[in-house]
Amino acid sequence: MVSDLSAYRGVEEEYSRSMILASITRQETIAPTRDLIHDLKQAGYKLYVLSNMSRDFIEYLRQQPVYEYFDGEVISCEEGVVKPMPQIYDILVERYGLDVSETMFIDDRIENVKVAEQIGITPFHFNREDAHSSCELLREMLLG
């Protein structure tokens, strides 16, 4: 990613890397999302990350306190496949022995949610523009 961005922008790779890292470290956890993740974990849910994150971003995220709540991960840059390719969902299901009929996939991109539904996983389209409402709906569905 760094070399592609550098070539595209016509700048040194070190400059691109520093700009990417600056962007990553400005990310903030959305409070309702963090709270929901905590509450789902406390209720006994197994939580997994299935993401198209860059290597730099996943390395940053793995150091964040919220990441301790996750039981496993499948990250596209480490697997060589990306969402919405069905293979990446299969990797998650097989690696962690998940039953698709008991699995929910939450994502902000409708194309990713549709593929999950096609393979038998319960889909939930998360609205990034209204994270609070999405979290409340998930809370009602999963925690009563």
Show the residue positions of the predicted features.
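General structural signal for secondary-structure boundaries
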Residues: 1, 11-12, 39, 63, ...
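Generic detector of well-ordered alpha-helical segments enriched in charged/polar residues
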Residues: 2-3, 17-21, 58, 135, ...
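Short, acidic loop-to-helix structural element flanking the phosphoryl-transfer center
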Residues: 3, 8-48, 86
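Short, catalytically relevant binding-site loops at active-site mouths
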Residues: 26, 55-56
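Amphipathic coiled-coil/heptad-repeat helices and related helical stalk/stem segments
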Residues: 29-33, 59, 109
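Conserved phosphate-coupling serine/threonine residues in phosphotransfer and NTP-handling enzymes
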Residues: 51
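Asp-based, Mg2+/Mn2+-dependent phosphohydrolase catalytic module
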Residues: 54-55, 61-144
